[in-house]
Curated annotation (Swiss-Prot):
Induction pattern: Expressed in the late phase of the viral replicative cycle.
Pfam families: DUF249
InterPro entries referenced in this protein's UniProt entry, alphabetically: MGF_505
Lineage: Viruses, Varidnaviria, Bamfordvirae, Nucleocytoviricota, Pokkesviricetes
Name this protein carries in UniProt: Protein MGF 505-2R
Keywords attached to this entry: Late protein
Keyword Mitochondrion set for record: no
Organism name: African swine fever virus (isolate Warthog/Namibia/Wart80/1980)
């Protein structure tokens, strides 16, 4: 139980100025040769009202002096007894240690707090039932290399202990200890170092392993292969690069990367490979049923164009892996759209035609993109794929209705009219009336006026009834959106038909009424 005095000392944070040295000594708040003691917060003290120390540092000093009264006071102030023991060991104050050894229990718990090797060894010696092996294991754990150096002769004779310490140094990542053991006494096998480095993702240890291995002048090809397989299987790019400094086959890395879907590895190395090698790994990806992202990455480095199609299909069937086909089909569409835009914008009509044939792109698709980019030359050149002029006109006429842009429609109609004008007169007659109605519907006044002139060249027997029917059909097509020029042309020809007695006055008036209602 705490005495009343202890309770007061524990909770007293401010010392009255009137307290002299005698009063402080009576209260137990005076440290001989140092001065008054005052608590500051939970983990600091004030000595002589001007020197601030951490409570634990003060405990170490008190322990070193063997001053149990100050130790007890500082323990009341939430100090750590372990620091008092460390100080006692430094000052050889074993009487003080014996007073508290029952409270300590396990002296191994103090070892992490000790900085110097001599005190470390003295502390470990307090554990009566521990020998040299235990000391060296703890020295390894807490990086106390001087202790290991002290026992170098014993370690050189005890091979098993040396190998054990080396493995522990790997597990605890004690690089100085690793270097010292290998460089002074050597270990039987460095594989344990590499295995632990890989499992812990410790690149520093991994690199150190190769330095030590290189010092032996024994970098085996089989070991490099094993390391490349392990590190690539885990997707450890920097470990792979470190291994490749000493040799090894990059194909091993890429095979593992494909198998385990490590795209970071793939992306790094694929850029360095020729197309033929990338196709080989694409086949492996199909065989291993790689993920969609892995397949996409491989295909992207091939620009989604695979030359060994037959072999690819054989792998797809043999390994029942159809994902690559789905990706190719989907990406091929998207890629062609993107490529078409650039082709039409920058390439000549001849070059576009060549690529269109190579990739089996439909001419309608090319023409629509060319219309969008206002490339009249490509529209004309591509349309020659239909050798028959009448078929060309029919195909282009069907496309007019699918084009959203007005400027595109006008351009296409000009191209169509140019094709029409190059027809022989007998062939023109086959399409002129259909084209005339299209021109009215699309407000193409110039082309409509021109085609009406051609109609007048027909002999009267054929001209009169067909032209009259054309005018009647056009009246059904015109709308409020029809341009004034179209209406003028229709009015002119309706009056002309009346003059030629092809229409009655009643028909003429009805037509004009419909035209301007």
């Amino acid at each position: 139980m705490f005495s009343l005095q202890d309770l007061c000392r524990k909770h007293l944070f401010i010392l009255p100025d009137v307290f002299g040295e005698h009063v402080l000594q009576r209260l137990g708040l005076y440290w001989k040769c140092h001065g008054s003691l005052q608590r500051i917060g939970d983990d600091h003290i004030l000595i002589r009202r001007d020197l601030i120390l951490s409570t634990n540092e003060a405990l170490r000093m008190a322990g070193e002096e063997g001053n149990n009264e100050v130790v007890k006071l500082l323990l009341l102030w939430k100090g750590n007894l372990h620091y008092a023991i460390i100080g006692a060991l430094q000052g050889d104050q074993y009487d003080l240690i014996h007073k508290y050894e029952n409270q300590i229990g396990d002296f191994h718990l103090i070892l992490p707090l000790i900085q110097d090797a001599k005190t470390f060894e003295k502390c470990h010696a307090l554990e009566r039932f521990c020998g040299v092996s235990c000391l060296l294991k703890h020295a390894t754990k807490y990086n106390m290399l001087p202790i290991l150096q002290t026992y170098q002769e014993e370690l050189s004779m005890r091979v098993y202990l040396r190998e054990t310490l080396f493995e522990l140094a790997c597990l605890w990542q004690r690089y100085d200890v690793l270097k010292w053991i290998e460089q002074t006494m050597h270990v039987y096998d460095l594989k344990v170092m590499f295995n632990i480095a890989i499992s812990k993702r410790d690149l520093t240890m991994y690199s150190l392993g190769y330095i030590l291995l290189f010092d032996r002048e024994n970098t085996e090809a089989t070991l490099l292969t094993q390391h490349l397989e392990k590190t690539a299987a885990k997707g450890l790019l920097h470990f792979v690069l470190e291994t490749l400094k000493y040799g090894g086959n990059i194909d091993i890395v890429l095979s593992q990367a494909v198998k385990y879907n490590h795209r970071k590895l793939l992306d790094y190395f694929l850029r360095q490979l020729p197309r033929k090698h990338i196709e080989k790994f694409l086949l492996l990806a199909v065989q291993e049923k790689a993920s969609k992202k892995t397949l996409n990455l491989l295909l992207s480095h091939l620009n989604y164009s695979v030359k060994r199609i037959k072999k690819l299909l054989r792998y797809v069937i043999e390994y029942e892996s159809t994902l690559v086909i789905k990706i190719l089909l989907k990406k091929r569409v998207n890629l062609i759209d993107a490529m078409l835009e650039k082709m039409v914008r920058y390439f000549s009509a001849t070059k576009v035609k060549t690529i269109m044939d190579e990739l089996s792109i439909s001419p309608e698709r090319v023409i629509k993109m060319a219309i969008q980019k206002m490339r009249t030359d490509i529209v004309i050149h591509t349309s020659y794929i239909w050798e028959d002029d009448l078929e060309r006109l029919t195909r282009l006429k069907d496309m007019v209705y699918t084009i959203k842009y007005e400027h595109g429609k006008k351009m296409l109609i000009k191209v169509m009219h140019g094709i029409y004008k190059n027809l022989l007169y007998d062939e023109r007659e086959k399409v002129m009336f259909h084209l005339a109605k299209l021109y009215v519907a699309q407000n193409a006044a110039t082309q409509f006026r021109d085609i009406c002139k051609d109609c007048y060249r027909l002999d009267l027997a054929r001209f009169k009834p067909r032209f009259k029917q054309l005018m009647l059909d056009c009246l059904e097509i015109v709308t409020k959106k029809s341009c004034y020029s179209i209406l003028e042309i229709l009015e002119k020809h309706i009056i002309s038909l009346f003059t030629m007695k092809v229409m009655t006055e009643e028909e003429k008036n009805l037509c004009l009424e419909i035209l301007y209602k």
